[in-house]
């Protein structure tokens, strides 16, 4: 029986921004590549990333407007060129940038004649306007226009339910998606005897964040979605261990002795400049450490085993794994 050798890929995935431009204040474009990928991985990543970019990133919108002078949505106001419906549509198009949580109040209060634009909106400190020139209304006469606004941060697309305007407020359908469009394409090539792929990812945003920022946030959101599956598997393993009469009890490791030995050598090497991604840590451990702002070996050694065990999804085997890797490093020999 002849067995074929199994090719183990030792490639390192790399991504790069190959094109970036701002077509306008409300239209940014970015083109990225990721390679080298094995056959089929391009679609796997591209489809997941497209869904995450369009559906998992939060944005900020005006979701409600209120004015005492407006009898109903399709009415007109004397002295204003636009109808109430047109004004609401213009407010809906305003692009906002924020890090707020929940709902905030904003307002417009201007006196005509003149042009009302986005710069006339009085915003809370946590919100800013991407394009101050966005048009809202034209006041043709010396009248006052006062509108109370509700601003909300959310994700996806929300269709508001009409409230019959009993409180003189008008709910607006909100498109919270800061990413306007995403395309992915795949270029296949042969490297030796192995078929590989390059993933091309094109991202258009509304200016509230750059395509690079959108890519980063979508990646983080995907990681957050997959972590529970890993945790569930760990719980399943622990359950089997508890119910297994032949289970092996993990030995107690002399964490403090090992860490104390490593800490004594702190002054001999530039620990602050050795990043944890330079060590061969499994992705799950690496992500757990990064989430707790542990970026270097200096940061890592400043945490006791008890502190490391408090990290969400962290296990006792992970601490042992970290110590084993550190002891294998030449600098810690």
From Swiss-Prot:
A GO-annotated cellular component: chloroplast
Database matches in InterPro entries: DNA-dir_RNA_pol_insert, DNA-dir_RNA_pol_RpoA/D/Rpb3, DNA-dir_RpoA, RBP11-like, RNAP_asu_C, RNApol_insert_sf
Catalyses which reaction(s): RNA(n) + a ribonucleoside 5'-triphosphate = RNA(n+1) + diphosphate
Full protein name: DNA-directed RNA polymerase subunit alpha
Region described as Alpha N-terminal domain (alpha-NTD): 1-233
An annotated Gene Ontology molecular function: DNA binding
Organism of this sequence: Cucumis sativus (Cucumber)
EC class name: transferase
Organism taxonomic ancestry: Eukaryota, Viridiplantae, Streptophyta, Embryophyta, Tracheophyta
Keyword Translocase: no
Protein localization: Plastid, Chloroplast
Region annotation Alpha C-terminal domain (alpha-CTD): where it falls in the sequence: 269-333
One Pfam family linked to the record: RNA_pol_L
Entry-linked CDD domains: RNAP_alpha_NTD
Entry-linked PANTHER family: DNA-DIRECTED RNA POLYMERASE SUBUNIT ALPHA
Source superkingdom: Eukaryota
């Amino acid at each position: 029986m002849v067995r074929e050798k199994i090719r183990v890929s030792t490639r390192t995935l790399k991504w790069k921004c190959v094109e970036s431009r701002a077509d306008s204040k409300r239209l940014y474009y970015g083109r990225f590549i990721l390679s080298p990928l094995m056959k089929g991985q391009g679609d796997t990543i591209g489809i997941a990333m497209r869904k995450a970019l369009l559906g998992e990133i939060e944005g900020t919108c005006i979701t409600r407007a209120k004015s005492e002078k407006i009898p109903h949505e399709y009415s007109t106001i004397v002295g204003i060129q636009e109808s109430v419906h047109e004004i609401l549509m213009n407010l809906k198009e305003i692009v906002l940038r924020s890090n707020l949580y929940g709902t905030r109040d904003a307002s417009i209060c201007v006196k005509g004649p003149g042009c009302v634009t986005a710069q006339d909106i009085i915003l809370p400190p946590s919100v800013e306007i991407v394009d101050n020139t966005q048009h809202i209304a034209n006041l043709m006469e010396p009248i006052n226009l006062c509108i109370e606004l509700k601003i909300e941060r959310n994700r996806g697309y929300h269709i508001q339910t009409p409230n019959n305007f009993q409180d003189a407020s008008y709910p607006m359908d909100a498109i919270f998606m800061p990413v306007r469009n995403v395309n992915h394409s795949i270029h296949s090539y042969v490297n030796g005897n192995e078929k590989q792929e390059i993933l091309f990812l094109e991202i258009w945003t509304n200016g509230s964040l750059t395509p690079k920022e959108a890519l980063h946030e979508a990646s983080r959101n995907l990681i957050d979605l997959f972590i529970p599956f890993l945790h569930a598997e760990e719980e399943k393993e622990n359950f089997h261990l508890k119910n297994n009469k032949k289970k092996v009890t993990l030995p107690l490791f002399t964490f403090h002795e090992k860490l104390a030995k490593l800490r004594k050598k702190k002054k001999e090497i530039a620990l602050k400049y050795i990043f944890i991604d330079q060590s061969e840590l499994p992705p799950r451990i690496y992500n757990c450490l990064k989430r707790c702002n542990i970026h270097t070996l200096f940061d890592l050694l400043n945490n006791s085993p008890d502190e490391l065990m408090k990290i969400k999804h962290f296990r006792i085997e992970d601490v042992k794994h970290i110590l084993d890797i550190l002891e294998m490093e030449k600098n810690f020999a």
